[in-house]
Amino acid sequence: MRILVTGGAGYIGSHTARLFAEYGHEAVVYDNLSRGHRWAVRWGPLVVGDLADGELLRKTLRERRIEAVVHFAAVALVAESMKAPELYFRNNTMGSLTLLESMRAEGVETIVFSSTCATYGHPVRLPLDEDHPQAPVSPYG
């Protein structure tokens, strides 16, 4: 299977790409390298691009014949999100929307989205589960 790993030059994304390669899949990494590292991409091709670039996303999905997407690309620091909420909205929210629109345009129907416990905010009860209320307390969440 050919899988696009957004944010694949980061810690979690690069390890995921390695596992895909070990299991015989082709992991195509899509990363803008703003926080990831070129040296971390060792188990498949790297496409340097931003989530905001719908044209490059569509071209990558089409030309690489991508069958599924694992989406890790995000800026992910709570304190920074409080100081620069527009960066988090632009990259995490609008970038994800551009990715989804590009997938739809190219007929790619499968996505795994890596989220965060920051979406829950302050816990109402413990342990947290998927039915817990979503009440983020930061732009990142």
What residue spans do the PLM features occupy?
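N-terminal Rossmann-like NAD(P)+-binding domain of SDR-like oxidoreductases, especially those catalyzing
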Residues: 1-141
